[in-house]
Curated annotation (Swiss-Prot):
Biological process (GO), any one: carbohydrate metabolic process
Gene3D superfamilies: Glycoside hydrolase/deacetylase
InterPro entries hit by this protein: Glyco_hydro/deAcase_b/a-brl, NODB_dom, Polysacc_deacetylase_ArnD
CDD domains to which the protein is assigned, alphabetical: CE4_NodB_like_6s_7s
GO molecular function: chitin deacetylase activity
Highest taxon in the source lineage: Eukaryota
Record protein name field: Polysaccharide deacetylase domain-containing protein ECU11_0510
SUPFAM superfamilies: Glycoside hydrolase/deacetylase (SSF88713)
Residue ranges of domain NodB homology in the record: 26-210
Amino acid sequence: MLLCLLYFTSSWCSGSDVPDVCTNSGMIAINFVDGPVRGVTDRILNTLDELGVKATFSFTVNQKAVGNVGQLYRRAVEEGHNVALRVDPSMDEGYQCLSQDALENNVDREIDTIDGLSGTEIRYAAVPICNGQVNSEMYNILTERGVLPVGYTFCPYDYDDPVGEFESMIEGSDPKHHSFIILMHDGQEADTSRLENMVKIGKDKGYRFVNMDECLQGYKGAPGDPELSLRGKGVESIGKGFLPFFLMMLVRLL
């Protein structure tokens, strides 16, 4: 229990709801976080191309000078994937020590940097998640800039048998009614067989693997929250709501 525990830091355990499923059923969106990783992220991109599926890469900007990975930011975009921002991991536990101005300046710098590296206006971010929520202060900073923090339905590293658990979840679902956002880490997928197996399981059940733009098309915010307006041109202004995963499963059981 594992890398995803990073996403359950106590200082983030109350705040604002974020989407953990897609706005429409029948989709699976994989969000690769904490890359790019030299020799791994490029292999993942090759595999996704061979499988004919799209995904999202929540890249950090502190990797840009490490291992000559700068070209991977643009490559991901050019191949039809979304590039998102993994907000500086060093702030996961120490953000409380920063002033509001310092937090905003740091986020602005990171957004400007990843925009330049990717050649696009990023619209999504990965920050620590706890019980489907992110810290309200960070949520407000990001959404005021047109960037949406994204949650997840399933993280394979939480289980001893990740592919088996994923298969059980998919087999117990219905593409006509369900969708999923999957959190994965570039650095844990050097052997792409797990990714390949998960894509096969999802496709065999009738799901499509999509980038975050398609997954969250028309998303305007959690019920009761102010309507969001995301930056860039990738999200259409269609008024659709979203139902958190646990509510979807409850409806299915009734």
